[in-house]
Amino acid sequence: MKTAIAERIEDKLYQNRYLVDAGRPHITVRPHRSPSLNLLALTRVCPAKCYELNETGQVEVTADGCMECGTCRVLCEANGDVEWSYPRGGFGVLFKFG
């Protein structure tokens, strides 16, 4: 009889490694007076929690830990809120399990 082991997604994500390209983030947020609804949504839907509101009400991105899933591209790139490009070769997420 097999024993089921409950694994949390956070435990699996912890196994991934990230090589940060210091000074060259692959994601930038366009300067804004007040964040669009899509930017505000990113603070909740980004699976890596890269987006957050700062103390002045602006949405900021921390690309360290980005899983390059494309959620921000789908949600915000068309209206210009976010600029996204692939990290340079050798940088970005290194998936341990697939």
Swiss-Prot record:
GO term, biological process aspect, one: nitrogen fixation
One MF term in the entry's GO annotations: iron ion binding
4Fe-4S ferredoxin-type domain segment(s): 57-87
Keyword annotations from UniProtKB, A to Z: Electron transport, Iron, Iron-sulfur, Metal-binding, Nitrogen fixation, Plasmid, Transport
SUPFAM superfamilies: 4Fe-4S ferredoxins
Residues passing through the membrane, by range: none
Domain of life: Bacteria
InterPro entries assigned: 4Fe4S_Fe-S-bd (IPR017896), 4Fe4S_Fe_S_CS (IPR017900), ETF-QO/FixX_C (IPR007859), Fd_FixX (IPR012206)
PANTHER family: FERREDOXIN-LIKE, FERREDOXIN-LIKE PROTEIN YDIT
Function of the molecule: Could be a 3Fe-4S cluster-containing protein.
Family assignment from sequence similarity: To ferredoxins from P.putida and C.tartarivorum, ferredoxin I from A.vinelandii, ferredoxin II from D.desulfuricans.
Protein name: Ferredoxin-like protein
Annotated gene: fixX
